[in-house]
């Protein structure tokens, strides 16, 4: 997935702009006597973007990580002189930043720094106010070194800085010492929550009693605003909002450490037209209301759910946290489907993937039934291109869908190890070869029968088939599978099967492990244990697992398996 954002040195995020990398590269190329706008620069830039996209699928890269990537790619492409010039350029810029920081520190000491307040007015910047804030937030924290934080803060202060940037700089200065003592984690969480409270409530509050009152009032206002803007389900207005607001316990925010608050703030809290509607406890209560919306005693049940969620004894899965109480309450985590050897059904499943990903569902697709490369298509009398081209389409569908606007789509494709296209399947995540036969953004998994492992142990041959000629292999397991598999091998020896191939089982196993080491894929999953232990064996065969390989449910052409996840806190 392409990189879209960059984390700046002050912790803020900006759009990813390749022209900035290109400009720095051009200076290094020119300094090294190379063509600053030639094909070599374009090739390096392309490689840099590719590495960043591959290595930062979930989290945006920082400026330093981008610069490290530039250095690596220059060395990889034997541009040693250019690399040397870039390193010098990078060191010079770091020195300039340090000089600016030192100048700012001197200005801060002599009182000549200015700060822009939230109302637009300017006033002299002093560290006294920052120190007062620190002491207030760290009043009960004995291991906090105020001087250490202020010293780190001074590195990012400059004349004309605004109040929001000071707060962000203070947060980053505190985060820098989280590994020093857990209390810095608590303090960082409080600093971030202070910012969050101000954004939701609309102003700063000076006392705990005042915060509690404003906190609860903001919950009621947020629910009404969310319904008014068409974001929340109107049924939420039928709850006793005043009673629920009194059940909210703002002190439970202390249970959430810095990374937890940051994750909730960036990805989970509801924002409408740029306005944040939720505090942590309002968020838990909104989820609780969404889970109770069809209950007869909805207010009682909402308070019960809230008590469990807000105390972190149990936390629902991401789709539930995203959508509970919203106008489209899709609460399920994972979907497991099996794709049949029919063009209409193939594209129906791809369309289903798109819709389920759209609402934050994780996808596990079984593709074993699709006929292999070279198998004859009855209707057109031409040879099939196999399963790989369809997997490429499924991959690109995964890339195209941004799950609920919060994270990229995620899919895992499963294929049984006797499929004639299994060797191409193993290469899907490689960075070399024909990119039209690669799925860089989709997970893959081997669905391995026990018979294959027996052949590996005994160093025997393994037969690969096209599923259109062996349709019952995928619908059987255990002894029944072994009997049918051996029968198909005998038929292949008699030339009664058109498409098949024999490989050494141990060589195929080694290739599986090699690709797993190289690319992390395909994952290793086992068909027979999943089916032997299935409590639903009367309802059909388990064809695959889900995106995360922890759920095994049977499915069919007209039945998609669904799982709903949550985390129980055993601490």
Stretches with model-predicted labels:
Residues 1-571:
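Extended catalytic cores of very large enzyme megasubunits
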